[in-house]
Amino acid sequence: MTTAETAWTEAMKYENRHDPYRFFDELRKTPVVQVADKVYVVTGYRELLQLAHDPHVSSDISKSPISAQPAADAQPDVGAEHMAAYGREPSLIVSDPARHDKQRRQVMRHFAPPHSPNVIPNMAADIQTLCNDSLDKIKAGVNGPGGNTFDVVDDYAYPVPVAVICQILGVPLKDEPTFHGWIFDFMAGADMGPDAATEEGQARQQKGKESTAALTAYMADLIQGFLTEPQDNVLSKLVNDKDGPDGPMTPSEAAANAMLLLIAGHDSTVNTIAHCVLTLLRNPESIELLHEKPDLIPKAIEEVLRLQSAVQFFPSRSVTADIEVGGTVIPAGSAVHLLYGAANRDPERFPDPEKFDIQRPDNQHVGWGRGVHSCVGGPLARLEVNIALETFLRRVENPRLVVDPPPYRVNQVFRGPLHLEVEFDRITG
């Protein structure tokens, strides 16, 4: 193996999930580098932005040389398991214009400005209630035996965004334990590293495929119900929209995009809340600063998004023509991974990149992606994380980490703690 191939393989290993960044630093010595046959990774900030806006970079998973490759065949060169989660039809995240543009317009028409400017702001009160309810349950000892400790992931970061996205989409919250298990299985099975070739990894993949099929069938049944009896939620509106310029989505398109939003609600937002708490507790002086100046909380969140990108990269992209970037020519037909987590720590763009600096100037990170595939749910996620973090800081007195580093999830793309145990003096209110 070359040095780059070794660094990439190490970054993908589960044992390094808590800190892949030292291997990203090694890769960044050549900001665009080949790490496997027909697979290139991009770690430089400038180079990533160039490719994020290049029309010759395709997100159509069917064009990627790794889209149908079994995980056991090669170490990190796999994308099929990730793509399987987005239904029988490709969602907007694995599509190119014009399919992507049409689906994005259809989703945004019912989810965000200009057509639906109040959907996200109107969720603020509900989000605040969910945050308070979660802390009240912890305070009352509902979620476990005595002692002033709780799991930030299971008891706080998870319940809030999942309840919100279910309400927006029209997914019954009573079904949450079932589809939570399906999504967990899928994400654990979508392993892009060498561990996927082990017996345990193969078992995770098989379970992930079975759970993906179950989730797909569940979404199909839910959508069929909305076609029969339309309701006031985004998913129902997507398949019943007769007034929009693009018309309704097909049931399979709606299922694919609903699964995308549901998975993002389960993982990227949950991981961001957990990483905010983890980062602040690793930097206790920052908690004092935010107590004194709570108006800096949004800037603190953006700095966490830089340090701990909600999505580390996405495995569907490929190039449709030879592209020269960063002194390297990426041949047409190659897969290309834009490593947001690495670009956000590029010292040429962010001075002292390992430092957590709440007041960092010009923090134009790529934690939510860039280009046409920038995160659809970014405004909602920012609102959720802002309220969750403000409430945590206001009500949880003297929080301390119990274990550092915490255990992490298997998945490399949606990287986040599996659990985050926190000890505290008391919960106020």
Tell me the role of every PLM-derived stretch.
Residues M1-G429:
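Cytochrome P450
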